[in-house]
Amino acid sequence: MQFGIFTVGDVTTDPTTGRTPTEHERIKAILRIAIKAEEVGLDVFATGEHHNPPFVPSSPTTMLGYIAARTERLILSTSTTLITTNDPVKIAEDFAMLQHIADGRVDVMMGRGNTPPVYPWFGQDIRQGIPLAVENYALLHELWRKDVVDWQGRFRTPLQGFTSTPRPLDGVPPFVWHGSIRSPQIAEQAAYYGDGFFHNNIFWPADHTKRMVALYRERYAHYGHGEPHQAIVGLGGQVFMRKNSQDAVREFRPYFDHAPVYGGGPSLEDFTEQTPLTVGSPQQVIDRTLTFREYAGDYQRQLFLMDHAGLPLKTVLEQLDMLGEIVPVLRKEFAALRAPGVPDAPTHDSLRAAKQQSTDGTADTDDTER
């Protein structure tokens, strides 16, 4: 099972000091956090994509390319790539280039985002959000799998004899996750292609997550990709830890109370009860995270949000040290609980091996027929 972190890249005032980091400071902090993730033994770092204040990650592949040059093992991903407003040709080329730079340590999570104004900023109509996601991904899927593409759709100029460059590393496109909070159409899309489904459930109760994941698993099997338990699932989460729960709650409360993303909603106690947010001791985080399997089934990727709400870099790095200490326990416990036949999360190496096996099998069949 893969464990990692994702960032939304918010620039938020620290309510305990009144200081707001500059964009430059926040960007540099994100890079340090990503490198720290590898140092403490995590598997994945993912960044969102935003084009409006107070967020800074407007160019995920630029950021991930820098991180790739300074890490050796970490899988580099997005927690949202805006399939609705980005040109699929540019996505195809940018992430193939990143594949080559990172020696395959790349996957990508498609999503529609949660900022309605981004549509007109990029010349699109929000009322066409789902059709855009469906059509643009269909083109991207083809661009990565065909050397020469002819294409005509509703939302972009036609392509004739087009080849996106560079081609995917080893002829293997990045593994794709489809991220969704509430859109069943995106779960359907992930199932149709046999891709991964990431339910970013950080603000949602368990029963909603259960329904979304169950839908994806059911449709994954419907489209003939395998049994429901073989579908590739990822979940989000939020944690804040200290050695004892009282200190964790006391320290995190002002960040929860003042962060725009939480402000004016339920209390910290209600929010932790209703969503995956866990504020407490390391053991409480372990126990709570293990319960995710009860409503989502066996799953392959767990990403935590840890660097938000104005938390200073020093605190986030301390949190990562603590996460690095509990992840081995989570790996062991999840592995012991996992049912037979549940696959691991795909990686570039596993996808390349599967492609080679398929090629060898085809060659053997051809030889037999001759």
Roles of regions detected by a PLM:
Residues 25-36, 94, 181-188, 285-291:
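Short, acidic/polar
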Residues 44-67, 82, 114, 201-204, ...:
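Glycine-rich, proline-tolerant flexible connector loops at the mouths of alpha/beta enzymes
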Residues 1-75, 342-345, 355, 369:
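N-terminal beta1-alpha1-beta2 module of alpha/beta enzyme domains
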